[in-house]
Amino acid sequence: MGAPLGEREILLGALPRCADPPCAGTWTRLVMNVLRIILGDQLSLELSALDGLDPRSDVVLMMEVMEENTYVGHHKQKIVLVLAAMRHFAETLRQCGLTVDYVGLDESDNTGSFTTEIQRAVARHRPSRIVVTEPSEWRVQAMAKSWEALTGVPVEIRSDRRFFASRTRFAAWANGR
């Protein structure tokens, strides 16, 4: 048996390979990059937002924003733990060969909000679309639903399969209870 696979090999092995078009070399290749958003409570290589990722062109956006740290009272140690986990996960993605646009809380131009940071990322990367796994909080879900209108870029909100049931399935089960 060979050596055990590391995180990089597991992630890259799960990614589909994009075949070159028949005109490769004849035409300038148009890259249709996707901006893939990972939120602070979504630190998983199995996240639906990463399905179909093309490491040659897609960009993963991760943001430390003040609005997430202040909308309710959080213990300072919890905030430090979440930010440290986010930074570690971003580094793991980079080691897997992915392009990560990481907006740190201490960056002078950080606007402090998901929406404006996504608008800034769209201006930087000019993606063909935005993909995000459905946020776990209704407040952030409402924000995600507004991003397409605010950026002019199609937004795909994917189901979060880290839960036992989708929101739709749970709502059907809970109906009338």
Regions found by a protein language model. Give the residues of each.
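Trp/Phe/Arg-rich N-terminal binding region typifying the photolyase-homology
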Residues: V31-R177
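Extreme N-terminal basic, low-complexity initiation segments
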Residues: G2-I10
